[in-house]
From Swiss-Prot:
GO cellular component, one term: cytoplasm
Chain's gene name: rpsP
A Gene Ontology molecular function term of the record: structural constituent of ribosome
Record-given protein name: Small ribosomal subunit protein bS16
Pfam assignment, any one: Ribosomal_S16
HAMAP family in UniProt: Ribosomal_bS16
NCBIfam families the record matches: S16
InterPro entries: Ribosomal_bS16, Ribosomal_bS16_dom_sf
Family of the protein in this entry: Belongs to the bacterial ribosomal protein bS16 family.
PANTHER family, per the entry: 30S RIBOSOMAL PROTEIN S16, SMALL RIBOSOMAL SUBUNIT PROTEIN BS16M
GO biological process: translation
Domain of life: Bacteria
Keywords, ordered alphabetically: Ribonucleoprotein, Ribosomal protein
Transmembrane segments: none
Length: 88
């Protein structure tokens, strides 16, 4: 079973938001999944990104591969969460 981290669409017509899920690569986009590991809402400004970081790390260590979009979201979240060093 090839596990992937990808987006599952939710919301209404023209107002989507997405769940970040760990699922088998053969399942449909909005089909069954193994675990819900976060939320991504691109309609909010700034974008709403809520991730269960420890569960995402667990799945990545277990061999799950993130989709291109989820990889981009993970990079944005890591960049936003990184502490800013004070200027000397």
């Amino acid at each position: 079973m090839a596990v992937v981290l990808r987006l599952s669409r939710a919301g209404t017509h023209k107002a989507p938001f997405y769940h970040v899920v760990a699922t088998d690569s053969r399942n449909a986009r909005d089909g069954k999944y193994l675990e819900d590991v976060g939320i991504y809402d691109p309609t909010k400004r700034p974008e709403r990104i809520e991730l269960k970081v420890e569960r995402i790390e667990h799945w990545l260590k277990a061999g799950a591969k993130p989709s291109q979009t989820v990889a981009m979201i993970l990079k944005r979240a890591a960049k936003a969460a990184a502490p800013v060093a004070p200027k000397a």
